[in-house]
Every structure is written in C-alpha cells, then in structure tokens.
Amino acid sequence: MQIRVKSLITITICLVALSPLTSAQSLRPRRSISTAILVRIIRAEDERRWDGNLLSLLTNRDPAVRVRAALAAGRIGNEGSLAELSNLLGHDEDQAVREMAAFAIGEVESLSGANALLAALKSSTETRLVRARAIEGLGKIAAALPKEQQARSAEISTAILEALNLEMQSQSPNHQFILLGITAVLRSRPANAGQTLTLLLDNKDARIRADAANALARTRAKDGNNKLANLLESDPDPDVRANAARVLGATEEKSAFEKLLASATHDEDARVRVSAIRALATLKDPRASEALLKYGTSITERHLKPLPAEQNEVLEVATALGRLYAMKADSGALDWLHEGQVEFDHSAPEVELAYVRISPDRYLSSFGSDQATAQRALQEKLILNWRSGASIAQALGEIANLPTAVENKSDLMSSAESLLRAMLNYKSSDIKIKSILPLHTEYGVPEVLRAYASYKPKDLVEVLSTHLEEDDVVVRATAADLLGDLPASQENTRMLVAALPRAQKDNLNDAILSILDSLAKQKNSVANEAIKSSLDSTDYLVRRRAVALLKTNSAGNFSSRIGTVHTRNTNADYKRAVARIGKRVRAVVTTTKGSFTIELLPDEAPLTVDNFAELASRGYYRGITFHRVVPNFVVQLGDPRGDGSGGPGYTIRCEVNEVPYDRGAVGMALSGKDTGGSQWFVTHAPQPHLDGGYTVFGRVVSGMNVVDSIVRGDIIRSITVR
C-alpha cells in the first residue's frame, strides 16, 4: 500500500453501523442484472474503456443497470462521462442511481464534476443519502485540486463544512452523512474545521467520535485537546482512545503527558498503547524515556516465543527511545537495543535507527574495531541476510542527517559513507557463501543505494550509472529515481535514455516508470523525445504516465495515445468472476499465528476477488511473509520478494466501491491507481481516509484476534477459498 474504499449500491443507516464480524456481502439490496450485461460492464471497466457501449447503459430502462454502469464510469475515470453522470445525479428518478452517480463523479476527481455535486448537496429536496455521497465526492475533488485552484478548493471546502454543520444541527442527524462529511472535511481541510470536529467528540456514537478524532489528528487541529485528554482516559471504545492519543501527539499537547504515559503502559488495548507510545515520542518530554525503557524491558524479559505479538510494541518503544534519547548515548537504552539487534539479527530497521540516533559512534564501532573489519562484516551481513543489510543501511544513512552541532559529524559521515560504499561493492569481495536457497542479496541494495545517495558522494553518478545496468528491476528503478533527484544534466539524460530500451522489455514496470519520471525532470527535448517512445508501450500504466509527464512538461497533449488496457482476462474469466456474484465466498487464511476467515465480496469487486482466488488456488501465497505491519493501521502481505516491491508480474485494475474501511476490512495494496497485483492488507482499525481510494474486496469475519497478533515476519501457510 504504498499504501496506502467502499460498496456498490445504497447504504442504509443500520448497515453503516455493520460490525466487521457480520456478513457484509452487499451493503445495498441488489437487483439482478443479466450475466451478459454484467460482462459488458466489467470488461469495459477492466479495459478502462469509456465509449458508447457504456454510455448507452447509463440510460438503460433498468435502474440496476444504470447504477452499475455509473459505478463503472467512475472507476474508469474518464472526464467524458461527467456530463451524463451529472445528468443522472440531477434528474434520475431512482435514488440508488443518483447516489451512485454522486459517488462516481467523486471518483473521477475532476473540477468539472463539482457543480453537480454542490447542487445536490445544497438541494432542499434531495435525500440525505444522495447528499451524503455528494459531500463525499466533493471531498475527493477538493483533495485532488492543484494549488492553482486554491480559490475553488476553498469554495468547495467551505460548502462541505457548512453542510456538515447543518446536518449536525438537525433534529435527527443522518449517521452516514455525518461520517462521510467528517471524511470530506479531512480531505478538503476547510478553515476552522477543528471547532466542528470537536463538537462531534460528544456524540453518543463511538464511530463518530473516533472518526472526528481521526480527522483532528490528520489535520493537526488542537481545538478538542481538552476533551480528547479526558476521552483518552475514560472512553469505553478503544478506537476513540487510540485516536485521542494520536491527536494529542500530533498537536504536541504537553499537558497530556501523564495521561499519555498511563495509556502507553497500562491501557488494556494494544492499539491504544501503541498510539500513546508514538505520541510520547513527539512530545519529547524526557520523563518518558526511563518509563518507556522500563516498559520495553518488562516485555522483553518475559522470554517470549519467536515473533510474539508483543514484537509490535517493542519496535514502537525502540522508535520512541531513539527520539527521546537522541545523541545522549544512554547506556541502558543502548544495552536494551543491542539485545534487540541480536534477537532480530539486525533486520529490524526500528532498532537500528534508534541505536544510531542515540549513539552514532557506538553504532559504527559495533561492526569492527577498524574500518576494514567493519566493511567486511557489513558485506557479509548484506550477502547472508538482505533484510539485515537493508536495515543497517537505513541506520548508516541516518548519520548524514545528524545536527551540524555534533562535534565529530564529519568523521562519522566519512566512516558511514565508506561502509555503504563497501556494501555496494559486495560482489567484489572474496566472501563465498554456500546456500541451497537463493539469498537474493540484491533485494537489500535499493536501501543501500538510497543511504549512500544521502551523503552526496562525488562518485554518486558513476555508482548510479552502474546500478542502472543491474539485472534486478527494483535496483534499476531505485538508481533511476536517485538520478532524477540530482540536478538535471546532459549526462544524466544520456544515462536514462540508454537505460530505457531494457526497461521497456521488463515484465515488471518499476524501472520504466522510474526512468520516465526522472527523464521528465531533465526538462530537455532529448528527454521528452525519449518519453514519447513509451507512448507505444503495451503497458497501459506506462502510456498513461508518459502522457501525463509530457503534458506537465508542455511537450504536447497525447491523451489520445493512452488508449485502453490490453487485459489478460478472457470472456471465460469474466464469466467465472460474475458467477460468484450473489454467492457466499470465503477464504481461510492459515498463518504461523493461527487462522482467520475472510468473507470475500465478489458483488463489490468481482475481478479482484477472482484474481485473489486464482492466486490462492495456485499456492502463490504459501510461504510468503507479512512484510509490513503497522500497529493500529494494517498488516500487509502478498509480496514474494518481501521488500514491498514484488508482485505476480501483472497488474489489475482498481474496483473502488462504497464499502468502508472498517476494522477488519481487506483491501488491495497499491503504488498508484490500477497498480494492484498480489499484495493486500487487513485494517486493525477504521481507516476512513482510505475509503474510495483502495479496493475493498473482503472482510475478516472470524479470527480478528489472530490478525491483531501478527507481526512482521509471520508466514502464510495456506489460503483456501471456498
């Protein structure tokens, strides 16, 4: 997810409050549509094709068809659909059609759709559910507007806040309108929004209180801090308490120190403890240092089994201590962190970063008494365990960011830079390792490259040029990204142009997209011509990126060259996906921590569910680790590389829907629109800012306690779909 959504037809108030452990196949009564029409619609979505075929379905006599076609138009995102969607919103007799039209307009994220949504929002005759989707859509449009449209953005955000205030003052405020209004405020960030959000902290509904606090945290508004300090102590809902801690940390509310410390060490819910630990790190109150070290020690002294659930808290404590003890060389903290280094074999970046922030001198000396010994030790670390090498590289890169006041900063930087240079030269070492399984040392190289680049060494261009020729696509992508960060030059242009033909033949598009981005930064005709060569790519994402970059560089409007997706799916694939609609489909995910069950949502995301089911049936996920765990946010998996960059060798289109990201929602991880493949995530807590941005294709209906216990490094044993 780099990471970094919702359902398909109308949501009633009672269903918005649906528990994540309740059956949630469809949030709106679904009227049947023929298989033939569904396949037509889904094929158009999959191909990202907006044409007369889909346009004609928007005027179909059957409102169910119009609803589904409107959703498809929103997913495709072509501005040419806005006129008809706006017409549906303003004039269709069916409420469900108008709701979906509003949702779809918001998905297009174009200012051209704003007037229709504003009219619906301000209408005195429109239903609250349609107006709720209108306020949601306006929030998306406001968030997507460029800085040049600041005046228009302010107009939209003001209308959003006014509408939310009016709804709050009504005799019976609509639950869904309030929730979607809060998220719209979060996205549009109107002036004085903190006052409105603070009023919602008194709401009787826990979800509304939690979402209001979430919005206050993300906007860093202090208006409700007094109330939030009390909620942190007394609210019965853990999501409210956790979000209260987040706000108090984000706004650096020093008066809340005692309450945050109590929550960090004694709250019964790990999500609250984690949020409070993070908040204490931002307050930078030295009183927290010893208390958190004591708390961390109390966990690690329990002699826990490998990969315990408590690992998540240990890593959060380590991160906090790195901030609180920065440059203080506290021996107690360093000794505790050293135990973590041994336990994780240096593979936890949180521990490595904390250690180097507290004592860069001691960190560097820990790898050897002299530079040659340390260089060889780190080469061996990278070769044997790329995760360890990558984590150490991040820590070495941190030394480049030391305050200028550090007395021996120059010596520390010189030492760290030479160690990173040695790690990049691991192939030239005489270290020979015999291993039955591939070590994939190259997976750690991108972090080493990024760390090395942070020192701005004299040979950086030469080093990046060399790595542009590596076999690993992610290494080449990283080298291209870093070249793009350097001042534009003819030499950089030449290297990037030379690297383009190979990237155009890759199965994965990471390198070519990075090369195109960096070419665009060169701002010269040679680079622009090279970008134009990718307009003929068979990869829709590459063509789309090339068109966007050329437009930004004023090198021409080639929008007509984007075309449609050359999809992998056949008619049989579409029929198989459609056949699951209306049926209960579940996946049992067995991990090293136990099993949890997902109710898949083929009604909402048929092709995403089909892709997941097909991968699972092939055993694709067997043995893959949870490579990313962010407590109180998500657990993420599905990357065969394990570094967050891997996938199945193809991408699928987003099937964004109206299903909200409640606790236990299952979504597709992305690095941009339509970039999903095999990586997916499960949310620990509601994440409304993800709604309408990432495909929700399932919900955990049992075993959420297993999800809560998962840590980075846990493994998938099997996934069975039935």
Q: What name fits each language-model region?
A:
Residues 46-59, 78-90, 110-123, 144-168, ...:
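Amphipathic alpha-helical scaffolding segments comprising HEAT/armadillo-like alpha-solenoid repeats
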Residues 24-75:
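N-terminal leader/linker segments that initiate helical-solenoid repeat arrays
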Residues 48, 63-64, 79, 94-96, ...:
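Alpha-helix N-cap/helix-start positions at coil->helix boundaries
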